[in-house]
UniProtKB/Swiss-Prot annotation:
Keyword terms: Acyltransferase, Biotin biosynthesis, Pyridoxal phosphate, Transferase
Lineage: Bacteria, Pseudomonadati, Pseudomonadota, Alphaproteobacteria, Acetobacterales
Family: Belongs to the class-II pyridoxal-phosphate-dependent aminotransferase family. BioF subfamily.
Annotated positions binding substrate: 22, 29, 134, 345
EC number: 2.3.1.47
Residues annotated as signal peptide: none
Assembly with partners or alone: Homodimer.
Family matches, as PANTHER family: 8-AMINO-7-OXONONANOATE SYNTHASE, CLASS II AMINOTRANSFERASE/8-AMINO-7-OXONONANOATE SYNTHASE
Protein name: 8-amino-7-oxononanoate synthase
């Protein structure tokens, strides 16, 4: 009989043979976007701290002050004793930024998606998900126990065909997509999605984890569009931690009563809430700051003759896991931290470097990086 340890060892060995094994590397945060790997100070090209607000003096001070005043932890779930007054201030700011009636904050983006989708969708409903949407969206869809169909990435013709065929057979239909796709950096075709959802009486939900704070002067990828369910995170451009849903007041009230990942988990620490509030205030006060990550990414794509960046995320597709690991190691020799992204995070044959640019990524380093990346592009083209 195979023991648990034998089972684990065999599975790990199989991953290692395919160069898909993961290990944790201790990475100290310096002043964003700089990190420490051991004694080496490296420029991070893999961090989602797009506005560098996680190390901003104002957010740090807000977290320190709130922790000193209110303590380290929430002490309970939000529906019992963990609903600190700072939550109200945070949710008011989120709703204002996103242009909705209300907002609700979760413990993380993953918790938000696995709570929101099952709270809205029943087994006799239908979920249509972009095939490249984040893993937590697919996890949330699975928990709803409804029929789920993945449509080809950003293919509105295919989505329209599915809606035409499937809509009459289901009580409700939920279309879910990333606003900014986390591994490719491209944007969802928001206007077309809104039009299709209206035409077929479907609900549209977008995950704006990588759009809030950096697109449309910080409002995110859904700004100016009628998107009733705007989900996102506070852990990237906002620089803190947590997830949220911005929606109408009735929808938020329903989620508060039905989302298990909201009900049965402890509230966020007061220091985290205070830091997020301060970060949102900084975003609202400085539209120019929100534009800088995309401007940095566009500089890089111009220098490398890549397609114009649509977000702060620029993928360098290399194909094999071995090629991605080799490219990552090469950049590390030049003090650039660019993690290799391999299956199952991305489809087989599309291993890559996922480069991210922040407001404080130096232009001089972007120019140097472009010189290092160009030979990789020539190799893949050939």
């Amino acid at each position: 009989m195979q023991t648990l340890d034998d089972f684990a060892a065999r599975r790990l060995s199989a991953l290692e043979k395919r160069q898909l094994s993961r290990v944790l590397h201790e990475t100290g945060r310096d002043s964003s976007p700089w990190v420490m790997r051991g004694e080496r100070r490296m420029l991070s090209l893999s961090c989602n701290d797009y506005l560098n607000l996680s190390t901003h003096p104002a957010t740090i001070r807000a977290a320190i002050d709130a922790t000193a005043q209110f303590g380290v932890g929430a002490g309970g779930s939000r529906l019992v004793t963990g609903n600190h007054p700072l939550y109200t201030a945070l949710e008011v700011r989120l709703a204002a930024l996103k242009g909705t009636e209300a907002a609700i904050v979760f413990g993380s983006g993953f918790l938000a998606n696995i709570g929101i989708i099952p709270a809205l969708i029943a087994p006799n409903d239908l979920i249509l998900v972009d095939e490249l949407a984040h893993a937590c969206i697919h996890a949330g869809a699975a928990l709803a126990h409804a029929r789920t169909i993945r449509f080809p990435h950003n293919d509105m013709q295919a989505l329209a065909g599915l809606l035409e065929q499937e809509r009459p057979q289901h009580d409700h239909v939920l279309i879910v997509t990333d606003g900014v796709f986390s591994m490719d950096g491209d944007l969802a075709p928001m206007s077309a999605l809104v039009e299709l959802s209206a035409r077929y009486n479907a609900w549209l939900m977008t995950d704006d984890a990588h759009g809030i704070g950096v697109l449309n002067e910080g409002h995110g990828s859904a700004y100016g569009h009628d998107v009733p369910l705007q989900m996102g995170t506070l852990s990237k451009a906002v620089g803190a931690y947590g997830g949220y849903l911005c929606a109408s007041a009735p929808v938020v009230a329903l989620i508060r009563n039905r989302a298990r990942s909201f009900i049965y988990t402890t509230g966020l620490p007061p220091g985290t809430l205070a830091a997020a509030i301060t970060a949102l205030d900084l975003i609202a006060a400085d539209p120019a700051l929100t534009m800088q990550p995309l401007e940095k990414a566009k500089l890089f794509t111009r220098l490398t003759s890549l397609p114009d960046a649509q977000s702060p995320i620029v993928p360098i597709l290399l194909g094999s896991a071995e090629a991605a690991l080799s490219a990552s190691a090469m950049l590390a020799e030049h003090d650039y931290l660019a993690a290799a992204i391999r299956p199952p995070t991305v489809p087989a044959g599309t291993a890559r470097l996922r480069l991210t640019f922040t407001a404080l990524t130096p232009d001089s380093d972007i120019m140097r990086l472009a010189e290092l990346i160009r030979p990789l592009l020539s190799d893949t083209a050939g």
